[in-house]
Each structure stands twice: as structure tokens, then as C-alpha cells.
């Protein structure tokens, strides 16, 4: 049964991952813009779900669209401070133009469904046939989409962060009522408030180093991590900071960025939360 469950999750992740690149392209815009309506050649974006689902390729001119905004990311050779990396991911307003941004290269489109499939399979393997697995599998593609957008343009749009937090809080309620649930809904809600509050304090202390989009993302990650208890919440949150620091250290060693370089922190927050959920699922089993 576990093998079948993992296989289904793997297929689900791969299938949904194939639909993410176009949405990531459309949402990878500057804060003053809502989303893209056309390809780089100017053709209207069409396709399933009003042009939101599918590969990053224009159906009219058959040209592949870039996975990040041209010119939005610089290629400086400075490195972030790995002790407290500059992780600002603004979601509204004007980006921090005083800090340089670390270079980012386009990820091959095959990586998106692969990463989504592996994430879903890992969640299925750790969680097993418990009701919360359905919630994890529904939320995982949107988390990957957020990571893609943040990686592309260093921002976490409200169109994704706020619905994700609401969905996590609402969907875990019915899951807690079903037999075999491995977590606590009240603790999940408190976890969202606590982690979101901690990130908000960090934002107030250093708004140039912590974007308000990170605060909103922390709400949803706190909910899912809090489902398995406070220890899992701490481990998942700490793992995000650790991964971000290691990434900054790698850039420093490679001389590809500087202390004032901004790095997208959302992908590390999400990866840390994934690790926390895997550990929490295994512990609950």
C-alpha cells in the first residue's frame, strides 16, 4: 500500500509540476505589476485556465519564455553575509535598490516537475495513509510555485502567500476530525501565528534583510509545521535559516555575491518546512 501511495504522489507531483512554469513566468514581475499577459514577443498568453497552466512556451510563436524577468537580477560578484543573510523578498512597494542581487540562472524546465514529484513522494513516504497527506499534496505545488517566483524576482506575491496560508489553516481542520490524523489543528493555527510573529519581528528589526513576503509565507509554513508540534516547528524553521546561510557561504566561497547581496529566502524556508514535515510525519508514524 505504501508503494502505491508513493507512486500516486510521485505522479501527482510530476503532473502538477509540468503545469507550473507558465504560472511562474506570469507571476515573476516587479512589485508594481500584477502579472504578465503576453510572451516576450508580445503575443497574448493563452491556454488552460486562461493561460495560467502549462509549460513556459508561447502557443502562438512557439518560443520558449524565460523563467525569470530579464534584467531584474544582476550578476555581481559580491557575497551575502552568511551569519545573517540579506533575505529580503519584497512583495509590494519598491525593491531594495541599494543592495546588489546574487546571480541566478534559469533552471531547466525538467527540474520543476522533478522537484515537485520528489517533494510529493517524500511527503507520502513520511506521512503514509493519514488524512493530512491530502493537504500536503494539495499545498506542495503552490509552495514550489512560490519558490520559483521568489528565485526569479526576489518577491513573494500576495496572490500566492495569503491564499496558501488560508488554505493550510482551513484544510487541516477537517483533516483533524478524520480517524488516523497525526497532528493537532489548534497547535497548527498557533504555529502559524508564532512563526509569522517571529518573522514579523525580524522584519521590524531589519526590513532590508527580511521582506514582508517572507512574513506572509511564514504564516502558512507555521501552520503546516505546527500540525506536528512545537519541536517540528522549530526544526523546520531552523532548517530554513541553516540552508540559507549555507547557500550564502557557498556564494562567498565562489566570490559570486557580496554581503549586501539579496538572496531569495523563500526557497530555503520552503525546503526547511519540507524537511520538518518529513521528520514530523515519520515521528507521528
Q: Across the structure, where does each feature detected by a protein language model lie?
A:
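Juxtamembrane boundary at the C-terminal end of a transmembrane helix
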Residues: 277-285
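Interfacial loop-to-transmembrane junctions
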Residues: 216, 249-275
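Transmembrane helix-loop junctions in multipass membrane proteins, especially transporters and channels
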Residues: 25-34, 125-129, 177-181, 207-208, ...
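Functional transmembrane core segments of multi-pass inner-membrane proteins
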Residues: 141, 145-247, 285
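Extended interfacial segments that mediate partner engagement and assembly in macromolecular machines
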Residues: 2-28, 43-187, 195
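Soluble N-terminal domains of membrane-associated systems
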Residues: 36, 40-43
